[in-house]
Amino acid sequence: MKTLGIETSCDETAIAIYDCEEGIIGESIHSQIEMHAEYGGVVPELASRDHCSKIVEVLNNALDDIPLESIDKIAYTSGPGLLGALLIGESFAQGLSTALNIPLIPVNHLEGHLMSPMMEFSELQMPFICLLVSGGHSMIAVSYTHLRAHETMAH
Protein backbone atom coordinates (compact mmCIF):
# COMPACT_ATOMS: atom_id res chain seq x y z
CA MET A 1 0.00 0.00 0.00
CA LYS A 2 1.56 3.28 -1.14
CA THR A 3 0.43 6.70 0.05
CA LEU A 4 1.49 9.90 -1.68
CA GLY A 5 1.58 12.80 0.80
CA ILE A 6 1.43 16.46 -0.23
CA GLU A 7 2.42 19.33 2.11
CA THR A 8 1.95 22.99 1.12
CA SER A 9 0.81 24.66 4.35
CA CYS A 10 3.38 27.47 4.37
CA ASP A 11 6.72 27.98 2.63
CA GLU A 12 7.78 24.48 1.60
CA THR A 13 6.38 22.34 -1.19
CA ALA A 14 6.92 18.74 -0.11
CA ILE A 15 5.80 15.40 -1.50
CA ALA A 16 6.66 11.94 -0.20
CA ILE A 17 5.66 8.42 -1.07
CA TYR A 18 5.25 6.07 1.90
CA ASP A 19 5.05 2.30 1.50
CA CYS A 20 3.53 0.40 4.45
CA GLU A 21 6.22 -2.28 4.24
CA GLU A 22 9.28 -0.27 3.15
CA GLY A 23 8.71 3.15 4.74
CA ILE A 24 9.53 6.31 2.78
CA ILE A 25 10.45 5.28 -0.78
CA GLY A 26 10.47 8.72 -2.40
CA GLU A 27 10.51 12.32 -1.26
CA SER A 28 11.25 15.82 -2.47
CA ILE A 29 11.14 19.25 -0.84
CA HIS A 30 11.35 22.70 -2.37
CA SER A 31 12.07 25.41 0.23
CA GLN A 32 11.15 29.07 -0.15
CA ILE A 33 13.35 30.32 2.70
CA GLU A 34 15.70 32.32 0.47
CA MET A 35 12.81 33.87 -1.47
CA HIS A 36 11.14 35.20 1.70
CA ALA A 37 14.35 36.22 3.51
CA GLU A 38 14.46 39.70 2.01
CA TYR A 39 10.96 40.39 3.42
CA GLY A 40 11.74 39.23 6.96
CA GLY A 41 9.00 36.59 6.87
CA VAL A 42 6.70 34.60 4.63
CA VAL A 43 4.68 36.61 2.09
CA PRO A 44 1.50 34.52 1.57
CA GLU A 45 0.88 35.50 -2.06
CA LEU A 46 4.47 34.76 -3.06
CA ALA A 47 4.31 31.43 -1.22
CA SER A 48 1.16 30.40 -3.11
CA ARG A 49 2.59 31.36 -6.48
CA ASP A 50 5.80 29.46 -5.79
CA HIS A 51 3.86 26.31 -4.76
CA CYS A 52 1.99 26.59 -8.05
CA SER A 53 5.15 26.80 -10.11
CA LYS A 54 7.10 24.05 -8.28
CA ILE A 55 4.58 21.34 -7.30
CA VAL A 56 4.81 19.31 -10.54
CA GLU A 57 8.63 19.32 -10.39
CA VAL A 58 8.51 18.26 -6.72
CA LEU A 59 6.13 15.41 -7.61
CA ASN A 60 8.39 14.21 -10.44
CA ASN A 61 11.45 14.31 -8.16
CA ALA A 62 9.63 12.37 -5.42
CA LEU A 63 8.36 9.73 -7.83
CA ASP A 64 11.75 9.28 -9.54
CA ASP A 65 11.26 5.73 -10.87
CA ILE A 66 8.05 4.96 -8.92
CA PRO A 67 5.10 4.63 -11.33
CA LEU A 68 2.34 7.12 -10.50
CA GLU A 69 -0.19 4.34 -11.17
CA SER A 70 1.25 2.34 -8.23
CA ILE A 71 -0.03 4.94 -5.73
CA ASP A 72 -3.03 3.64 -3.72
CA LYS A 73 -4.14 6.82 -1.94
CA ILE A 74 -3.28 10.49 -1.60
CA ALA A 75 -3.04 12.48 1.63
CA TYR A 76 -2.68 16.25 1.74
CA THR A 77 -2.37 18.96 4.38
CA SER A 78 -5.82 20.47 4.90
CA GLY A 79 -4.85 23.05 7.53
CA PRO A 80 -3.92 24.98 9.51
CA GLY A 81 -1.71 27.07 7.27
CA LEU A 82 -1.75 29.83 4.66
CA LEU A 83 -5.06 29.63 2.79
CA GLY A 84 -3.66 30.11 -0.71
CA ALA A 85 -0.83 27.65 -0.10
CA LEU A 86 -3.24 25.05 1.26
CA LEU A 87 -5.55 25.46 -1.73
CA ILE A 88 -2.68 24.72 -4.14
CA GLY A 89 -1.92 21.43 -2.38
CA GLU A 90 -5.57 20.46 -2.05
CA SER A 91 -6.37 21.22 -5.69
CA PHE A 92 -3.33 19.28 -6.88
CA ALA A 93 -4.25 16.34 -4.65
CA GLN A 94 -7.85 16.38 -5.88
CA GLY A 95 -6.70 16.37 -9.49
CA LEU A 96 -4.40 13.40 -8.94
CA SER A 97 -7.05 11.55 -6.95
CA THR A 98 -9.62 12.04 -9.69
CA ALA A 99 -7.22 11.13 -12.50
CA LEU A 100 -6.04 7.96 -10.73
CA ASN A 101 -9.46 7.14 -9.21
CA ILE A 102 -7.97 6.63 -5.74
CA PRO A 103 -8.99 7.85 -2.25
CA LEU A 104 -8.15 11.34 -1.04
CA ILE A 105 -7.38 11.90 2.65
CA PRO A 106 -7.28 15.40 4.19
CA VAL A 107 -4.80 15.57 7.08
CA ASN A 108 -4.75 18.23 9.77
CA HIS A 109 -1.21 19.63 9.83
CA LEU A 110 -0.94 19.47 13.62
CA GLU A 111 -2.37 15.94 13.83
CA GLY A 112 0.18 14.90 11.23
CA HIS A 113 2.93 16.13 13.52
CA LEU A 114 1.36 14.43 16.54
CA MET A 115 1.15 11.06 14.77
CA SER A 116 4.50 11.22 12.93
CA PRO A 117 6.43 9.34 15.66
CA MET A 118 4.39 6.25 14.73
CA MET A 119 6.19 6.13 11.36
CA GLU A 120 9.58 5.71 13.02
CA PHE A 121 8.59 3.98 16.25
CA SER A 122 5.80 1.55 15.35
CA GLU A 123 6.13 -0.08 18.78
CA LEU A 124 5.12 3.20 20.47
CA GLN A 125 2.21 2.48 22.80
CA MET A 126 -0.81 4.73 23.14
CA PRO A 127 -1.49 6.93 24.92
CA PHE A 128 1.66 9.02 24.57
CA ILE A 129 2.52 12.65 25.31
CA CYS A 130 3.76 14.94 22.53
CA LEU A 131 5.47 18.30 22.58
CA LEU A 132 4.58 20.08 19.35
CA VAL A 133 6.33 23.22 18.11
CA SER A 134 5.34 24.08 14.53
CA GLY A 135 5.32 27.61 13.17
CA GLY A 136 2.89 29.61 15.28
CA HIS A 137 1.52 26.51 17.00
CA SER A 138 2.98 25.11 20.21
CA MET A 139 1.29 22.61 22.49
CA ILE A 140 1.61 19.63 24.75
CA ALA A 141 -0.91 16.96 23.83
CA VAL A 142 -1.85 13.41 24.71
CA SER A 143 -2.57 11.11 21.75
CA TYR A 144 -5.00 8.35 22.74
CA THR A 145 -5.70 6.54 19.46
CA HIS A 146 -4.94 6.71 15.75
CA LEU A 147 -8.47 8.02 15.20
CA ARG A 148 -7.93 11.71 15.89
CA ALA A 149 -8.34 11.34 19.65
CA HIS A 150 -5.94 13.93 21.07
CA GLU A 151 -6.24 16.10 24.15
CA THR A 152 -4.42 19.41 24.39
CA MET A 153 -2.88 19.81 27.84
CA ALA A 154 -1.25 23.20 27.26
CA HIS A 155 -0.69 25.64 24.39
Stretches with model-predicted labels:
Residues L82-G84, I102, F128, L147-R148:
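Flexible, glycine/proline-enriched loop segments at strand-loop-helix junctions
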Residues Y76-L100:
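Short Gly/Thr/Asp-enriched flexible loops that form oxyanion-binding sites at enzyme active sites
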Residues T3-G5, K73-A75, A85, F128-L132:
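Short glycine-aspartate micro-motif
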Residues T145-A154:
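Conserved small/polar residues in nucleotide/adenosyl-binding loops
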Residues K2-S70, Y76-P80, H109, H113:
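N-terminal beta-alpha supersecondary unit
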Residues T13-Y18, C130, S138-V142:
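Short beta-strand scaffold segments in enzyme catalytic cores
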Residues I102, P106-I129:
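Conserved phosphate-binding catalytic cores of ATP/NTP-utilizing and phosphoryl-transfer enzymes
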